[in-house]
Amino acid sequence: MISGPDRSLFAYALVTAAYWAFMLTDGALRMLVLLYFHINGFDPISLAFLFLLYEFMGMVTNLGAGWIAARYGLNLTLYAGLVLQVGTLALLAVANPTTVGLASVLLVMGLQGLAGAAKDLTKMSAKSAVKVLVPEGEAGESRLLRWVARLTGSKNAIKGLGFFVGAGLLQTIGFSAGLWVLAGGLALILLGALALMPAGLSGRKRAALPFSTIFSTSSALNRLSLARVFLFGARDVWFVVGVPLFFYAQGWTFAAVGAFMAVWVMGYGVVQGATPNLLAIRTGAIGRSVRALRVWGAMLVMILLALSATVLSLQVDGLTAVVAGGLILFGGAFAINSTLHSFLVLAYAEAEDVTLDVGFYYMSNAAGRLLGALLSGVIFQTFGGVAGKSGLLACLLVATLFCALAWLVSIRLPQTSTKVEAR
C-alpha cells in the first residue's frame, strides 16, 4: 500500500503520464489535420475555422468541468477527457473527409470540437490535481511552482513531439491509419490509469454547489485570466496558421514543417520546466513570480517589435531564417510567462475551489486561443502578399498589441496570496 508523500508522488506520476499521452495525440492530431486538409485544398480561413470549435469547446468545457470536478471528483473529468479523445480520433479516422465544402468543414469542426472538450477536461484535471497533492504553506508554494513547471513544461515538450509524430504518420502511413494508431495507444494508457490510480485524488467533493460558482469572484484571478486571453491570443495569431503556411510557401516539406514546429514546442516545454531554476525562485514564490512576470512580459513585446521591424525591412528570400530565429526567441520568453501564469492561478486559488478557479482561468486561456486561431487564418489570407510576407507581418503586429495588453494587465497582479470571496 502506497501512503503519505510516496502516494502523492505516485498519483502525480500517473496523472502526468496520462496527460503526456493525451498531449502526444493532441499535437499529432493538430499537425495531421492542418497538413492533410491543406493539401486537400482548404485555404487558410477554412483551416482556421477547423480549429474554432476546438477552442470554443475548450471555453465551455473548462467552466462546466470545473464545477463537475468539484461536485464529483477529478478522476471523473480526467477519465472522461481520455475517453472522449479516443472516440474523436476513431470517428475522424472513419469519416476521413477529403473534399472541400461546407459539409466537410462542419464535420471536421464538430470532431475538433470534441477534441477540444477532451483536451480541456484532461488539462483542468491534471493541473488541479497538482494543487490537491501539494501541501499548503511557503514550502508548499515553492514545491507547487516546481511541480507546475515540470508538468506544464513536459506537457508542451510531449505536444511538440506530437507535431513531429503527426507529420511523420501522414507522410508514412496516411491520415486514417495514423489516427487509428493514436487512438489505440491512448486507449491503453486509459486502461492503465483506471487500474493504477490511487483513491483520494479527487479531493473534497462538494454536494451543494450552485452552477453560478463557475465564475471567479477574485480580482487577482480575473486579472490573471484577462492577461491569459491576450497572451495566448498573441501566440496563436501567428503560430496556428501563419507560421506553418509561411514555411510551406518557402518550399518546406510537410515533414520539415512538422519537425520544426515539434522542436520549437519541445524547446518551449524545456524552458517551462526549467523556469524556477532560471529565475532562481526558492522562497516568496508569489511575489517574485509577479515581479518576474512584469519583466518577461515586457521582453515579449520587445522581441515582437524587433521581429516585425526586421520582417518589414527584408525581402522574402531572406526571411525564413529570421522568422525561425524570432520564433525561437519568442518561444523562450513566452514559455517563462506561461509558466508564471500557470503557477499563479494555482497559488491564488483556494484548495477546496481549485477546480472552479482553474476551470475559469483555462476558459480564458481557450478564449485567447480561439481569438488567435481565428485571426491567424483571416489575417494571413487577407494580407498574404508575396509568399505570405505581408500576412505574417500583419499577424506579428497583432501579436505585439496583444502582448502589450497582457503586460499592462499583469502589472497590477497582487504579490501575495489572496482569499477568494465566499462562493
Residue map of PLM features:
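A membrane-interface helix-boundary motif in multi-pass transporters
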Residues: 170-185, 318, 378-404
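Multi-pass alpha-helical transporter architecture, strongest
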Residues: 186-198, 307-312, 395-423
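Hydrophobic core of transmembrane alpha-helices in multi-pass small-molecule transporters
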Residues: 20, 88, 101-122, 320-337
